[in-house]
Amino acid sequence: MENVNKQSFQEVLEYVRINRQRNKLLREIGDCERKIRDNKKRVLLLDNLTDYIQDNMTIEDIRAIINNMHDDYENRVDDYVIKAAELSKQRRDLKTRMKELKASHAALAKKGKE
């Protein structure tokens, strides 16, 4: 019986650890989504800025800088999209593991009562 309680306690600790990790991933996913949104806004801003700059302003260097910034922001958006996908996969894996632990714990508790 003591062995069952010890195993049950270990499973509860594992469940809590996984739940905390899942919550952390959810926060990181939200953070990535905010960063994606912010960088998309920057890309739009730079697109609009490029439309307003006229060739007669003789600021070709500024255009080059703006284009570089635009590319940098687009790359950041892509990086955050990839990171969000990776975090979502980890979250799904943890959720599956939590279900398995919960089922295992329920079976163990049922066995312990018998």
From Swiss-Prot:
Family named by the database record: Belongs to the pole-localizer TmaR family.
Pfam families: DUF496
Keyword flag Zinc: no
InterPro entries: DUF496
Location(s), subcellular: Cytoplasm
Biological role stated in the UniProt entry: Pole-localizer protein involved in the regulation of several cellular processes.
Stretches assigned to coiled coil: 70-111
Official protein name in the record: Pole-localizer protein TmaR
Native organism: Actinobacillus succinogenes (strain ATCC 55618 / DSM 22257 / CCUG 43843 / 130Z)
PANTHER family membership: UPF0265 PROTEIN YEEX
One Gene Ontology term, aspect cellular component: cytosol
Key words of the record: Coiled coil, Cytoplasm
Stored HAMAP family: Pole_loc_TmaR (MF_00683)
Transmembrane segments annotated in the record for this chain: none
Domain of life of the native organism: Bacteria
